[in-house]
Structures are given as C-alpha cells and as structure tokens.
C-alpha cells in the first residue's frame, strides 16, 4: 500500500477525489490501536495517516467543548484541558488512541457507565466524502432536531462512509477527589446482582467493572499488583467487583465510599477493600491492560460482546460451558455497568475456535445483545457479523454505504467483508 500524511482537510479532499476517480481503495489510520483490523490497508491501496492532523484547535470553556483534529491522542487532549477544570471523558483501554479512532469505532471504556461512549460525547464533525466534498455535521449546540443526524451516522462507521477531519467533543467537569472499592465475591451471580443495586443508589460510579478470578490472578502476576487481599480470600472467590467514585468534595467522597463498602458487604461480598491513590490507579491501569495480560498467558483471541446487564450471568456461564466443551477456556473482565464483556478465548484447534466464537456471538445476540460493544466489526469480525446479523439490516447498511461511497473506495473489506 501507498501512504499519505495530509495536513489539512483540503489535502484529504484532494486525495479522496483522486482515489474515487481512479478506483483506489483508501484506509484511514489514527494511532493504530484498534483491535478489529479496521486500519489495516488493502494491498495496492492508499493509507491516509492522520499523524500530522494532531492539534487541539480550541478549548471552548463557555460551551464546554473542544475542537480537535482526528490525530490528537487522548493524552494530549487531556493535557490541553487540564487547566480549564474540564476534561474529555471517553477513556478506552489505550490512552494513546486518537480521537478520530474513537469516533470511528464509537469507543467506550471503563468510564462509559457514567459518561457514555463516543457518540454521547461528540457533538459535531467535519468530514470529507469520497467525492472530495467537505461537510460539517452537528456543532457546538447541545441539541438539534433538523433533518437526519449525520454526526451519529458517521460515528462508529469505521472509516467506511467518510473521513473525519475535525471533531467537536463535549467536555465534563474534572472532579479532583476519587477512590475505589474492590470487593471479592464467592459467587459470580452475586457480583452481577450487586450491579443494579449500586446503579440505583444514586452514587453514580464512574467505573463499575467485574474481573473474574483467573483474570485477576493474571493481572496480579503480570502487573506486579499489591492489593492487600489475603491468599485465602483470593483462592475462594469467583470474581471481583471494582467500584470507583469521584467527587469535587473530599468529605462527600469519603461518605460515598463508606456507603458503597457497606452495600457490597450487605450484597454478599466476602470483604470490601478501599483502594486510594496509587493502589487504585495501578489496578485501573492494570485492568486496561487485561487483554495483553491474557495474551501473555496464552489467549488466542478477545471478544467484546455486549448484552443487557441482567443477561450477563447467563451469558458468561453459558460461554464458559461452550469453551470447555471445545477443549478451550473463556475468561475475562468487563464493564459490568453497561453489559460489555471482554472475554479472552483460548482454543488451540482452529476449527473448534471458529465454531466457539460463532456460538458465543450467537449467544450474545440471542440474549438481545450484539457482537461488539466498542471495538467494532473491522475485518476480524465480518464473517460473524454477516452470518448472524439480520439480513434486512445488513442490506440497509449496504445502501447507506452506497449513498456515501458509490465507488466503494473507503475501507473495502471492513464491516461487510467486500474487497
């Protein structure tokens, strides 16, 4: 593939217009952190890298938005807003990821339980169509009810409809005080039964994660975590619930943390450990690296299915049973607050693994869920998507793709598997 690094929207427009006229496939690339292969270029095609379009153009505190280019890394956006008392709250597992990549996959992360995913935090876009036309969608306003919402249509489209060249993101107040509670449970069903109680309590956790015992052991061993949990408790528990809270007032945070700890004990936790400062940060950072910890211990693949929260116990127990029947294993952690399961799959037989993955994805959909909650379909999941998704919906998506990209140059092979 050939590569281009445009510096302006106009240069992107020139590249796309020429590519359309000559039938050259185009793949956009941000920081390359995606887990579904959507940024992998087509042989003989053009890779458009947004490395040079990496500026925070404006931080507008009056409207609580930032205007950024797609190549801006989340760490750089956070630094640019640090002195304003505001922040962008979409925090996927890799903070070096770009805002453009977040938009492309509708990224989420651990804080989605409180702040939502990318589509809840992106108010407007500038995008270039495959014809070379430049459009603006949305804006700095909090709401709009004028025609179709093109901003939301482009978010999550994985570079198949248009290339984003500017993003208006919503900013939220920074809350200076935070702490976490880690609670081991002897039974996984108790973990999931605690989740709706915490969400209904009014405490508004910004992180609400489950971690199964196998994954916690992997995190502790690979990330050198010292959590102060006795071996006897670690050996006897099936899963953990991590609850993080934030507040602008330290005393209120202390009261809320006490309340959470008491609730967890009443809901069946073996114990509740308050993690402050460095310990909490280390565990959260380790949780963000859970995929790599699983890979280091032999996992062959990872899935990020999403199901209704109430269906998580059935999904996880059934998935583990399917894996065992295939002479494999399915372990993991995930966003308990929004039903997003991050499961590492270990299965050495390629045919068995493919069937296992299909069965697990089918299970998620039978329970009212979806194949991917935040990683996207990309190239890696196209076969499963086309096999399991409603064909009427797929047909409609193809027609939308055709309307935006009649020449079919944008990211062929992604979502639909066409090359």
Q: What is each stretch, according to the model?
A:
Residues 19, 159, 343, 405:
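Conserved, mostly hydrophobic/aromatic
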Residues 55-62, 66-209:
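FAD-binding subdomain of flavoenzyme oxidoreductases
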Residues 30-33, 93, 210-213, 376-377:
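Short, ordered loop/turn segments at secondary-structure junctions
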Residues 370-377, 412-413:
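Short acidic/histidine-rich active-site segments
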Residues 133, 382-419:
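Activity-critical C-terminal alpha-helical subdomain
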């Amino acid at each position: 593939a050939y590569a281009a690094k445009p510096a302006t929207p106009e240069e992107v427009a020139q590249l796309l217009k020429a590519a359309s006229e000559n039938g050259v496939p185009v793949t956009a690339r941000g920081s390359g952190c995606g887990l579904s292969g959507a940024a992998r270029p087509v042989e003989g095609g053009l890779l458009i890298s947004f490395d040079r379009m990496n500026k925070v153009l404006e931080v507008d505190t009056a409207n609580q938005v930032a205007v950024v280019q797609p190549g801006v890394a989340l760490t750089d956006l956070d630094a640019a807003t640090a002195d304003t008392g505001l922040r962008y709250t979409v925090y996927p597992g890799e903070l070096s990821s770009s805002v453009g990549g977040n938009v492309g996959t509708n990224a989420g992360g651990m804080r989605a339980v409180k702040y939502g995913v990318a589509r809840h935090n992106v108010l407007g876009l500038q995008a270039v169509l495959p014809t070379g036309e430049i459009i603006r969608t949305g804006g700095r306003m909090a709401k709009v009810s004028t025609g179709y919402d093109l901003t939301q249509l482009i978010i999550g489209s994985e570079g198949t409809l248009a290339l984003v060249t500017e993003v208006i993101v919503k900013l939220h107040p920074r809350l200076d005080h935070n702490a976490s509670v880690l609670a081991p449970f002897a039974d996984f069903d108790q973990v999931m039964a605690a989740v709706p109680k915490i969400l209904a309590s009014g405490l508004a956790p910004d992180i609400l994660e489950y971690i199964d015992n196998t994954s916690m052991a992997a995190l502790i061993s690979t990330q050198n975590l010292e959590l102060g949990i006795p071996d006897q408790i670690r050996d006897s528990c099936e899963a953990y619930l991590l609850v993080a809270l934030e507040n602008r007032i330290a005393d209120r945070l202390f009261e809320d943390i006490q309340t959470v700890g008491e609730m967890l004990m009443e809901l069946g936790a073996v114990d509740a450990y308050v993690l402050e400062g460095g310990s909490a940060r280390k565990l959260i950072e380790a949780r963000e690296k859970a995929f790599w910890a699983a890979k280091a211990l032999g996992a062959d693949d990872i899935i990020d299915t999403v199901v209704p929260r109430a269906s998580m116990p059935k999904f996880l127990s059934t998935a583990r049973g399917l894996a065992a029947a295939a002479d494999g294993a399915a372990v993991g952690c995930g966003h308990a607050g929004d039903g997003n399961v991050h499961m590492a799959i270990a299965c050495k037989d390629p045919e068995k693994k493919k069937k296992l993955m299909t069965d697990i994805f089918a299970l998620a959909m039978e329970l009212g869920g979806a194949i991917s909650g935040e990683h996207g379909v990309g190239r890696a999941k196209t076969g499963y998507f086309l096999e399991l998704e409603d064909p009427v919906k797929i047909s409609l998506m193809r027609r939308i793709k055709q309307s935006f990209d009649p020449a079919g140059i944008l990211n062929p092979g992604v979502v639909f598997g066409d090359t």
